Amino acid sequence: MLAIGEFMVKTLPLMEALKSLNLPGLERNLFSSPDWLTVLYKTYNCHLFVKYIEREGRIASYLIYCVVKNFLEWKICICSYCDYFDCYIERPDDWKLFFDALRKEYPQYRIAVRNLRDESARAFPEFKVLSQERFHFLDVRDPLEVVWKRTHDSFKSAVKQSQKIGVKVRKCEKKELRDFFQLHLDLRKNKYRLFPQPYRFFDYIWQQYMEKDRGGLLGAYDPDGRFIGGNIYLICGDTLYYKFNTSQLGSLKYRPNNLLFWEGIKFAKERNLNYLDLGSSGWNQEGLILFKNHTGAKSLDITHLGFTPPGYKFSQKRILKFMTRFFTTRWMPDFMLEWGSSIIYPYLA
């Protein structure tokens, strides 16, 4: 623990903190929830910690962070493998206490914060804006026909086209998770030249969510019954999270993504949920942003904030770039790419 000013900043490993502390607001969104953090811990062996401040016998403020120390960089990330991560901050001045504690404990580490709604983090003078992404969320509290009416005409047209062709969407069983993963691997390898997330990541998601009836994999099937796309939806609080999507290369004529999303809205309504979180989109992903806009969703900015200590040298990540290009060449067998992903992806925290 570290005494700074009037209050004590204390630290515990995350898994210990989840067992011994009453951390308020953990279920405020998916990324701060114990289920999601457990998936990250099991998949990537993340070094996750909690710093917290107590007042009047209760935890008043806390932040959850990942300590990253590898051949690529040294950093404190709030928080790795999350679209965004707003900390639980009671007073704006608490950011100063946490910042000073992190700087004292990790003087050579940069600090990275994925901020969506925490105004106190954006106002903290030590943090600089590094970049921004787009974030979308959809209010689905109105009757289904009203939600449908708010979608763009092009979205409606694509859904109707998909239905007319004969595409069917249904909730998948665990055995079909492999079909989803294969399309995910194909898309990342052949279209984007990126590592796929390792299969164990999706397997742990299934254990934490689908086996507890807190999510679902919706699969799209062409008229011949072939799996051509899928969406993974996760539930936290009153919100359904549109977490992962993939579709078969060359399946555009079937418009599976539009139908999958519409069925996701219906899934949210069936579970009496109020909102649909569409996640983040890079500003260069114009097609994805347009798709989300056409669902009737509203948008905000995810702001990447950071602090860099004097003399910090950013890695050029030449080894990572080489490995990525090498493993995603067209002649690379899929089992080799999957193996490479299981080794490399933990370094992408």
Predicted feature residues:
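A gly/proline- and charged-residue-enriched helix-loop-helix capping module
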Residues: 79-120
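Acyl/amide activation-and-transfer machinery of modular secondary-metabolite enzymes
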Residues: 78-86, 130-137
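Short beta->alpha junction loops/turns
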Residues: 91-92, 173, 281
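Short catalytic-loop micro-motif centered on adjacent basic/acidic residues
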Residues: 112, 170, 275-279
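A conserved beta-strand-loop-helix scaffold within acyl/acetyltransferase catalytic domains
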Residues: 2-56, 62-73, 116-253
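Aromatic (often tryptophan-rich) hydrophobic motifs at membrane interfaces
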Residues: 82, 96-101, 204-316
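Short, high-confidence coil segments that cap the C-terminus of an alpha-helix
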Residues: 46-48, 106-110, 215, 271-273
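Active-site/acyl-donor-binding loops of N-acyltransferases
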Residues: 67-69, 122-146, 273-349
